[in-house]
Structure formats: structure tokens, C-alpha cells
Amino acid sequence: MSGRLDVLLVTGMSGAGKSTSLRVLEDLGWETLDNFPIRLLEPMIGEVLSSDNPAPLAVGFDSRTRGFVPNEIIELCKRLVQRDDLTLTTLFLDCTSEELERRFNETRRHHPMARGRTALEGIRAEREVMEPLRRWAEAVIDTSELAANELQQLIREQFHHDDPASQSVTVSSFGFARGMPPLADLVFDMRFLDNPHWVANLREQTGLDPAVGEYITARGDFDEIFQRMRDLILALLPRYRAQGKAYVHVAFGCTGGRHRSVFTAETMAQALREAGFSPTVVHRNLASRAADQFEGPQGRN
């Protein structure tokens, strides 16, 4: 085969959505394995790599999986990320203990670590065991407030697998007041621009409104800076692709994530379309709670 094999490890709290995520990935063309013995992962990857035109590989595991020892799994991941024939990503599905308890009670299923104790006690015990993997994971999705269809849509948007020659680009806006998006590859701070929030008739508008865009472009050096950012991004995208990186997330931030970052993200997405890309646009502080949860835990307002 030529190029790198995409390998996605899907783990997290029991009841947080691992099975749902794997079903979506299978529909997207990934080869999926659930509760696959950890000790067999490297041989399995070798077998997949030896085949012609292998599909990307998604492997699900959790505290019930045979050979599950978090620190040993992390050491395995450290070895795998050093390889030049694959690209490894770890996805951790999280959820609040209270919501997990509600889900287990609603479905009348027993939590795997609740033998001889309450479901909530089992959930808390599992959370302690899983914490090292949560810290290791590049991608964390909190499913506490997500319906199944919302989680499915997030997985489709983030992990759809195109032809190796193509590239999935996400352009997003966010507010620093709620923390940076942990999945972003490139982050641009737009707080050097004058803030429309302090203009009374623009405060309740957003970067999607023409008046906000006119205000931003009429003041300062937006056009010059934007062109430099555009040139940098267009120069980096093919270099990322050459290194086997199929997904690139470009994020623009401002204080509240409603004006400057939104306008810049929309303008950059249009520039990328004109350059032949088909970017996905996400406005974290404007979008549904689904997109908000995908980006990571909320910070203080």
C-alpha cells in the first residue's frame, strides 16, 4: 500500500456512546473492531497494512476489554505514533456520572464495574481507571447532553474518510472565554481587531451579519492580515496531506466567539472554497450544544 493507514482508537466511559460511534464509522467505510484484545492490536495492524488498499481501522475498547491496562495501552500508543506507516488518533467518549447513571437505570442494564455496589459507585470507579486514557486522547467528546443522532452527526463530520488524495478541513470560531478547542491544529487569535461588541447596534448581531463584517473590514489591517493567514493555511494544507494528515482543523478565536472570530472563519471558509477545498464550518459559540460539546469542556464565562 502507499500512504499511511488511519487508525482510530475509540474508548471511554461505559454508556457514553462507543457502540454508536463504531456503527457510524462502519457506515463511513472504516473497518471496525469492538472489544478487540489489546495484545493483538499490533499484529492486526500489520495484517491490515499488508493488504491491498486497506480501509481505515477503528478499534473500540473499554474497561471490559481483555487485557485492559490503561498505562500499558498508552505505552502501546506511544510506540504506534512513532511509526511512519500509520496515523493514530485516540477518541475518548465521556459523560457525566449522573447522566450515565440515568442511562443505565433507564435501559435497566448493569454497569460492568457495579458488581456488589450501586451503578453510580461503579461509574465512579471506572472513571478513576479510565482517567489516564482521557488525558492521553487527542479527541474528547462529552456526550452528556447529546442525543444519539447528534453524536452520530459529530462522528460523521469529524471522521468521514475520503480518498487519500483528498483532505477534510474544518474551519471554526470560538471564544477564548470558554477555552480553546482541543482538536484544533491551527489557532489564530483575532482579538487584535476592534471588538464590535462595544458598538451598541452591533452587540446583538454576530459575525454572520453584514454590518459586523463591514465594521471589521473598515477598521485596522484586516485585509492584509487575512491574506497572510490565507497564504499560510494554503501553504500548510498540502504539507499536512503529504505527512498523511487527513483532517485539519483551523480555528479562529476572539473574546466571546460571536463577532470577530465568526466573520474571519466565514471569510476563510469562502477563500478555501475558491481554492478547491470543501471546508466544514463550525461556530462553537453560535452553534447547537452538539458542536459545543464536541469541542471540549466549557470554560468560565
Curated annotation (Swiss-Prot):
Pfam family, one: RapZ-like_N
Keywords assigned: ATP-binding, GTP-binding, Nucleotide-binding
Domain of life: Bacteria
Record SUPFAM superfamilies: P-loop containing nucleoside triphosphate hydrolases (SSF52540)
Binding positions (ATP): G12, M13, S14, G15, A16, G17, K18, S19
Biological function: Displays ATPase and GTPase activities.
Name by which UniProt lists this protein: Nucleotide-binding protein ELI_02120
Species whose genome carries this gene: Erythrobacter litoralis (strain HTCC2594)
